[in-house]
Amino acid sequence: MDVCVFVMTCKDLADVLARLFRRGVKIRIITDKEQLQASGSQIWALMKEGIPIRTNDSSYLMHHKFAIVDGNVLINGSFNWTRQAITGNQENLIITEDKNITQLFMREFQKLWEQYDPNKVADRET
Protein backbone atom coordinates (compact mmCIF):
# COMPACT_ATOMS: atom_id res chain seq x y z
CA MET A 1 0.00 0.00 0.00
CA ASP A 2 1.39 3.37 -1.01
CA VAL A 3 0.04 6.40 0.87
CA CYS A 4 0.76 9.95 -0.23
CA VAL A 5 -0.92 12.46 2.09
CA PHE A 6 -0.34 16.04 3.13
CA VAL A 7 -1.16 15.42 6.79
CA MET A 8 -2.13 12.45 8.96
CA THR A 9 -3.46 13.22 12.42
CA CYS A 10 -6.25 10.62 12.62
CA LYS A 11 -5.07 7.99 15.11
CA ASP A 12 -7.68 5.47 13.91
CA LEU A 13 -6.35 5.55 10.33
CA ALA A 14 -2.74 5.38 11.56
CA ASP A 15 -3.62 2.42 13.78
CA VAL A 16 -5.07 0.57 10.78
CA LEU A 17 -1.86 1.16 8.83
CA ALA A 18 0.25 -0.04 11.77
CA ARG A 19 -1.85 -3.21 12.13
CA LEU A 20 -1.58 -3.94 8.40
CA PHE A 21 2.18 -3.40 8.52
CA ARG A 22 2.53 -5.77 11.49
CA ARG A 23 0.61 -8.39 9.49
CA GLY A 24 3.16 -8.13 6.70
CA VAL A 25 1.50 -5.68 4.31
CA LYS A 26 4.13 -3.58 2.54
CA ILE A 27 3.39 0.09 3.25
CA ARG A 28 5.23 3.22 2.13
CA ILE A 29 4.19 6.73 3.10
CA ILE A 30 5.03 10.12 1.63
CA THR A 31 3.97 13.21 3.56
CA ASP A 32 4.72 16.91 3.83
CA LYS A 33 7.83 17.63 5.87
CA GLU A 34 6.30 20.53 7.78
CA GLN A 35 3.29 18.42 8.73
CA LEU A 36 5.53 16.11 10.76
CA GLN A 37 5.36 18.81 13.43
CA ALA A 38 1.58 19.28 13.15
CA SER A 39 -0.34 18.87 16.36
CA GLY A 40 -1.36 15.23 16.66
CA SER A 41 0.74 14.03 13.72
CA GLN A 42 0.68 10.23 13.60
CA ILE A 43 3.71 9.99 11.30
CA TRP A 44 6.18 9.61 14.19
CA ALA A 45 4.23 6.63 15.57
CA LEU A 46 4.24 5.00 12.13
CA MET A 47 7.99 5.61 11.82
CA LYS A 48 8.48 3.85 15.16
CA GLU A 49 6.54 0.89 13.74
CA GLY A 50 9.18 0.69 11.01
CA ILE A 51 7.00 1.90 8.15
CA PRO A 52 9.19 3.60 5.50
CA ILE A 53 8.33 7.29 5.32
CA ARG A 54 9.70 10.02 3.10
CA THR A 55 9.05 13.74 3.12
CA ASN A 56 9.51 16.53 0.63
CA ASP A 57 12.67 18.62 0.80
CA SER A 58 11.18 21.83 -0.48
CA SER A 59 9.48 24.93 0.86
CA TYR A 60 6.57 24.01 -1.41
CA LEU A 61 3.82 21.77 -0.07
CA MET A 62 3.57 18.08 -0.83
CA HIS A 63 -0.20 18.41 -1.02
CA HIS A 64 -1.30 15.11 -2.58
CA LYS A 65 -3.99 13.05 -0.88
CA PHE A 66 -4.08 9.58 -2.40
CA ALA A 67 -3.45 5.96 -1.60
CA ILE A 68 -2.93 2.93 -3.81
CA VAL A 69 -3.98 -0.45 -2.47
CA ASP A 70 -2.42 -3.61 -3.94
CA GLY A 71 -1.50 -1.71 -7.10
CA ASN A 72 -5.14 -1.98 -8.18
CA VAL A 73 -7.27 0.43 -6.18
CA LEU A 74 -6.82 4.19 -6.11
CA ILE A 75 -8.28 6.31 -3.31
CA ASN A 76 -8.01 10.01 -4.19
CA GLY A 77 -9.64 13.29 -3.26
CA SER A 78 -9.55 16.34 -1.02
CA PHE A 79 -9.61 14.14 2.08
CA ASN A 80 -6.76 14.78 4.53
CA TRP A 81 -6.24 11.86 6.90
CA THR A 82 -7.56 13.77 9.91
CA ARG A 83 -10.39 13.20 12.38
CA GLN A 84 -12.00 16.45 11.24
CA ALA A 85 -12.02 15.26 7.62
CA ILE A 86 -13.89 12.15 8.74
CA THR A 87 -16.37 13.77 11.11
CA GLY A 88 -16.99 17.32 9.94
CA ASN A 89 -15.38 18.66 6.78
CA GLN A 90 -16.97 18.80 3.37
CA GLU A 91 -14.64 16.44 1.49
CA ASN A 92 -14.58 14.38 -1.68
CA LEU A 93 -13.07 10.97 -2.19
CA ILE A 94 -13.07 8.77 -5.28
CA ILE A 95 -12.22 5.09 -5.19
CA THR A 96 -11.49 3.47 -8.54
CA GLU A 97 -10.02 0.32 -10.00
CA ASP A 98 -9.48 1.95 -13.39
CA LYS A 99 -6.04 0.64 -14.36
CA ASN A 100 -5.13 3.66 -16.52
CA ILE A 101 -5.82 6.13 -13.73
CA THR A 102 -4.25 3.97 -11.04
CA GLN A 103 -1.08 3.55 -13.11
CA LEU A 104 -0.70 7.33 -13.40
CA PHE A 105 -0.83 7.68 -9.63
CA MET A 106 1.55 4.76 -9.14
CA ARG A 107 4.07 6.50 -11.39
CA GLU A 108 3.63 9.76 -9.49
CA PHE A 109 4.16 8.00 -6.16
CA GLN A 110 7.30 6.26 -7.41
CA LYS A 111 8.66 9.52 -8.86
CA LEU A 112 8.18 11.27 -5.52
CA TRP A 113 9.53 8.28 -3.57
CA GLU A 114 12.76 8.48 -5.56
CA GLN A 115 12.86 12.28 -5.49
CA TYR A 116 12.51 12.34 -1.69
CA ASP A 117 15.15 9.66 -1.10
CA PRO A 118 17.17 11.08 1.83
CA ASN A 119 20.40 9.83 0.23
CA LYS A 120 19.68 11.83 -2.92
CA VAL A 121 18.82 14.89 -0.85
CA ALA A 122 22.16 14.59 0.96
CA ASP A 123 23.94 14.26 -2.39
CA ARG A 124 22.31 17.47 -3.66
CA GLU A 125 23.40 19.36 -0.55
CA THR A 126 27.08 18.40 -0.90
What are these regions, as identified by a protein language model?
Residues 6, 66, 105:
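Short, structured motif recognition centered on aromatic/hydrophobic residues
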Residues 7-11, 33-37, 59-61, 73-74, ...:
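Solvent-exposed loop/turn segments at secondary-structure junctions
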Residues 46-47, 60, 67-70, 87:
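Extracellular/periplasmic catalytic domains that process cell-envelope and extracellular macromolecules
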Residues 73-126:
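Signature of lipid phosphatidyltransferase scaffolds
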